[in-house]
Amino acid sequence: MLVVGLTGGIGAGKSTVARMFAARGVEVFEADEVAHRLLEPGQPALKAVARAFGSDILGADGRLDRAALRRRVFAESKARKRLEGIVHPLVYAELARLVLGAAGSYCVLSVPLLLETGRRRFVDRLLVVDCPESLQIERVVRRSGLRPEEVRAIMAAQVSRSERLAAADDVIVNAADTAGLEAEVDALHRRYSLLAAA
């Protein structure tokens, strides 16, 4: 099975592209969804994160207060690395399990921090969704309510745009209309299907 890693900076449009592949019948596994499941109440990962960062990152209902944790980890790189050391191995183990059970000729792993975690070798091809940084900031502010400086802090913690593009096997530029994006996904879907059959 061909494994395509889908990545890009925050607000680049990874989720939109992932949905387009899924609409074409491709199994898409989202690292963020896996991480959310692993951090549900009662899960060992949440207990480990609470031990590492203190119970003030939990809400009254026992759920993770993502905003509180985000403020802490993006303010201090050591805290971010500690969180990643707890969560990322569990996420990749679950993604590997999902890939083993996947049907079809290829699957897509949508992993925002694929390069940052040094897991490029985890995938056969790297697809980067790209757009201008100003558009990334605009999109994230619009959808999340974060302030522009908060978005910039998140972007600063990610691999640079130029590093992502240099590592890519394939690039989708998501700066225009949906029809153009659909056409790019169609072309890549055909290409990946052929590569998987070879």
Swiss-Prot record:
Annotated localization: Cytoplasm
Reactions catalysed according to its record: 3'-dephospho-CoA + ATP = ADP + CoA + H(+)
Keyword S-adenosyl-L-methionine: no
Molecular functions per Gene Ontology: ATP binding; dephospho-CoA kinase activity
Pathway noted in the entry: Cofactor biosynthesis; coenzyme A biosynthesis; CoA from (R)-pantothenate: step 5/5
Major place of residence: cytoplasm
Any one of the GO BP annotations: coenzyme A biosynthetic process
EC number: 2.7.1.24
Extent of the signal sequence: none
Binding positions for ATP per the UniProt entry: 11-16
Domain DPCK residue range list: 3-198
Top enzyme category: transferase
Key words, A-Z: ATP-binding, Coenzyme A biosynthesis, Cytoplasm, Kinase, Nucleotide-binding, Transferase
Any GO CC annotation of this UniProt entry: cytoplasm
InterPro entries listed in its UniProt record: Depp_CoAkinase, P-loop_NTPase
Role according to the record: Catalyzes the phosphorylation of the 3'-hydroxyl group of dephosphocoenzyme A to form coenzyme A.
NCBIfam families: dephospho-CoA kinase (TIGR00152)
Family per similarity comment: Belongs to the CoaE family.
Protein name: Dephospho-CoA kinase
Organism: Methylococcus capsulatus (strain ATCC 33009 / NCIMB 11132 / Bath)
